[in-house]
Amino acid sequence: MKLSLLLTAALTAIAPLGAADWTQFRGPNGDGLSGETGVPVRMEPSSLTWSIALPGRGLSSPLILGDKVFVTAGSGARQDRLHVLCFRVTDGSLLWERQFWATGRTMTHEKIGAATPTPASDGKAIYAIFSSNDCVALDLDGRLLWFRGLGRDYPNASNSLGMSSSLVVVDGVVVAMVENDSESFTAGLDARTGVNRWKLDRPKKANWTSPVVFKSPGQPNRVLLQSAQGVTAVDPTTGKIAWDITEGASTVPSLVVSQGRLVIPANGITVVEPGAGDAKPKSIWRSAQLRPGTASPVVVGGRLLTLNDGGILTCADAQDGKRLWQLRLKGSFSATPVVAGGHLYCVSEEGRVQVVDPSKAEGIVVSELALEQTVIGTPSIAAGSLFVRSDSRLVRLGGTALR
């Protein structure tokens, strides 16, 4: 196996993840939900705690672990300078920054960039991947643990629009989806060393969805891989396929797990329920009326919400898919909504934060705040705050000192 650079090191033992940590795309459970309290419902200019400039563009969500917030960026005319930065949650001060040269293709669609995928953390390290298929592991103090140039190891693994699948880390394995029209695969990288634990050939079609960890009491963890062909569940430690759903799925918004069911964007929404062990999931319901755009669906309080690119927020009963209401939000949307305190936080591409109460007979916009910045990436929630990453800045809304 070719490694562009491989440094191995023992990972420093630290305390377990706190309940408020935001450790991957769409939060600790990959569903967009946070148990955090105190996030402002009434967004107003005074909600701005701090706003700091970033050295480059990116769509990746911030990760928050304790009093540290981590974010990636890409800079340079060719987006070939890759950055991982760490700031202090309380005041936004820079704690450290690490830079790397990209080894793979960095050209992307103008709307995205090199730092599109969201990193992941197991509480011991930050694992970041870029559109160039460069993957790096750093400890929480910024020390390099390992670096994989997957774009160099697998030079045909790219697409003309750019790669955007985020990482997950589970059972000591970092799962990277590198799915495209040519050399398409998903790999399980050893979290300690970056070496392949396994590599699974995948459908040869461009795919921008992200892997999702499926946990069931008393059962081994599974990683769900979504593609145009459907959803595949794999053992994260071996890459062995546990089961397949082959009825097709979206290649942009990712599925979400709620109450043991999979809510899959697939020409609308398809909901399935896995059986005992590795039995193939059974279909629960389908709806062509619920059509997410770029944003992934979210389920809160028994209600399923989808948001399309034009700002139409649709709410349905999560049990049967019956549509309850629709609400037009201001602006266009790429970011997935996130939830705290039963409220939906939606951030438009124009940087307008809109807080929605989805629990009533009709959706209600409780408050809104114009950041006047371009926002494509999904926000994060921790420390009583909403963290929004724009094209040029990282913003904290709400919260004071870390509790």
Locate the predicted segments by residue.
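Noncatalytic, solvent-exposed loop/strand surfaces
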Residues: 17-403
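Bacterial N-terminal signal peptides
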Residues: 4-16
